[in-house]
């Protein structure tokens, strides 16, 4: 699949700056997106080495297209572990089928990727959380159907203990995005996301408030090995 289907269109996709979602769906149909997830979420319960081999081989054909399995595995680990079962099932079965992509929004203009030093605010308002602030350098920010957002629910002095995570559908009112003019990796794209009084259902909270730092670290523990294999490919 990597050599026959992914490699031939690499330059055309990069020049167009557009992700080929039909090719992503092909990948999903072959079971090559987040196979380490449980079968209930569309995976096959495979091990880390299996998932890593997929990323390495896809990256050998097209480094940028390898973001498809990489981002799926990173977000999949977090959603499978912390989202409500019905929400995880809804999003992850579509993700593993290649119907959608997901992004992860941690990095901010002032604090970088310091997960304990976030400025984006998330406040409870009845059955919703209201998000205000900016994320930047987010991969797939304009093509993702949803984004796992890490935001501050506690006081700034709470540090890591005041960070929470929530799954945000990207079609909600109040969300705007921009795309960086990159030298490469144009298929997936990178850019900023602004949240202006974005109302997200409270049921989309991942786990408990104040547990976001531990959640993102758990996701990164898995994805770091995949990033290394992406570079190796």
Go through the PLM ranges and name each one:
Residues 46-47, 114-116, 140-145, 158-162, ...:
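Short glycine/proline-enriched turns and hinge-like loops at secondary-structure junctions
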Residues 60, 112, 136-142, 222-226:
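Glycine-rich phosphate/pyrophosphate-binding beta-alpha loops
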Residues 63-86, 112-115:
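N-terminal glycine-rich flavin-associated loop
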Residues 1-69, 86-97:
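Amphipathic, small/basic residue-rich leader segments at the start of a protein or domain
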């Amino acid at each position: 699949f990597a050599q026959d289907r992914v490699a031939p269109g690499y330059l055309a996709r990069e020049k167009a700056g557009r992700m080929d979602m039909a090719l992503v769906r092909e990948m999903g149909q072959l079971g090559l997106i987040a196979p380490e997830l449980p079968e209930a979420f569309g995976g096959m319960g495979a091990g880390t080495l299996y998932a890593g081999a997929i990323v390495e081989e896809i990256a050998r054909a097209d480094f940028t297209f390898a973001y498809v399995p990489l981002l799926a595995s990173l977000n999949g680990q977090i959603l499978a572990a912390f989202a409500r079962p019905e929400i995880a099932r809804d999003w992850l079965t579509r993700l593993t089928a290649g119907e959608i992509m997901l992004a992860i929004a941690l990095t901010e203009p002032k604090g970088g990727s310091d997960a304990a030093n976030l400025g984006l605010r998330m406040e409870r308002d009845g059955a919703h959380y209201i998000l205000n602030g900016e994320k930047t350098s987010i991969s797939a920010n304009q093509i993702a159907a949803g984004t796992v957002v890490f935001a501050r629910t506690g006081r700034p002095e709470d540090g890591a203990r005041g960070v929470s995570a929530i799954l945000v559908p990207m079609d909600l009112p109040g969300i705007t995005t921009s795309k960086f003019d990159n030298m490469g990796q144009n298929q997936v794209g990178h850019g900023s996301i602004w949240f202006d009084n974005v109302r997200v259902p409270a049921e989309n909270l991942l786990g408990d408030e104040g547990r976001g730092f531990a959640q993102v670290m758990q996701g990164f523990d898995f994805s770091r090995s995949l990033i290394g294999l992406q570079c190796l490919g």
